[in-house]
Regions:
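Charged linear interaction tracts used for macromolecular binding and regulation
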Residues: 91-234
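N-terminal cysteine/histidine-rich coordination modules
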Residues: 1-109
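Generic recognition of long tandem-repeat/solenoid scaffolds
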Residues: 39-42, 62-66, 180-189, 251
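Short, surface-exposed beta-strand/loop "edge" segments at domain boundaries and coil↔beta transitions
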Residues: 49-50, 71-76, 190-198, 244-250
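OB-fold/S1-family single-stranded nucleic acid-binding modules
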Residues: 228-264
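A broadly conserved detector of short glycine/acidic/proline-rich loop/turn motifs that flank catalytic sites
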Residues: 47, 170, 242
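Short, solvent-exposed coil/turn linker segments
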Residues: 15-31, 153-156, 202, 218, ...
Length: 264
């Protein structure tokens, strides 16, 4: 994942401001949005670094970047470099199911947890130090690295040849395909209900997940329009690579520990 996508949310007036919310506002009025937030957006990890709004070269998405010569606190996760493709594969292959579950649960709850820090916590202290370790790995050389994450509620879905933690509020439907594979279809939860991506789930993995995802409609009908019309609202977090095929994005859940779904 590019470094430009590291900040998926920030702090504004001591509250969480999601990047996808900021992005929607930006594309309604670019200059007004820049003026409103100039100098007001802070790093969500340490709240010591101011962030600026920048537009990607495709003119269809934004990212947040630290002001020049600004410095994160020593333990801030946003100070770290992103883990490499190989480091991510090794980490997620070896992660225990318990830690994986806590990590995915945390990212689904994180927006709430960070809004209300303990009353005795200094706002310049690292926020949620212990929980923040959920998003770090230590490689074989003892170097700590940042685990890349991306909101499903941003304007653009992107390919990724390395493992990324995706999360967000969306609509879900399961299509049962040939050879006992299942496909978790993810749609936007907005007026467009656009098809975001499809996650292939092999039958042996699906069986482990059946209790958690049994509220999601499952049919053998592979028609995308049918899937969208019958989809249900949920919050989801998963870890996968993403490949673009034709006009659709595809991923795969290789282990039950790498998917968490919460019914809304």
């Amino acid at each position: 994942m590019p470094e430009t996508n590291k900040y998926q949310y920030c702090m504004y007036n001591n509250e969480v401001l999601e990047l996808h919310v900021l992005e929607e506002e930006f594309y309604r009025n670019k200059q007004e949005t820049k003026n409103r937030y100039r100098g007001q957006l802070l790093c969500p990890g340490c709240r010591q670094v101011r962030l600026s709004i920048n537009e990607n070269s495709n003119n269809n998405s934004i990212y947040l970047a630290a002001y020049p010569n600004s410095h994160h606190s020593e333990n801030c996760e946003y100070l770290l470099n992103s883990a490499t493709k190989r480091e991510l594969k090794v980490f997620y292959d070896q992660i225990s199911p318990d830690r994986a579950e806590k990590m995915l649960e945390h990212i689904l709850e994180d927006r709430v947890a960070v809004v209300n820090p303990p009353h005795n916590q200094n706002l310049n202290d690292d926020v949620n130090k212990d929980e923040g370790d959920n998003y770090k790995l230590t490689n074989e050389n003892g170097t700590r690295k940042y685990l890349p994450r991306r909101s499903l509620q941003l304007r653009k879905m992107e390919e990724s040849d390395h493992l990324v933690m995706y999360y967000g509020e969306c609509r879900l439907f399961i299509a049962q395909g040939k050879w006992d594979n299942f496909y978790l279809r993810i749609f936007r939860n907005d007026e467009t209900t656009n098809f975001l991506c499809s996650l292939k789930i092999p039958k042996n993995v699906f069986n482990y997940l059946s209790d958690e995802i049994n509220f999601i409609p499952c049919e053998k009908d592979l028609d995308v329009n049918n899937s969208m019309e019958n989809s249900v609202l949920a919050r989801i977090a998963f870890i996968s690579t993403i490949e673009k095929k034709s006009s659709f994005f595809d991923g795969k859940i290789t282990h039950s520990k790498l998917l968490k779904v919460i019914q809304l």
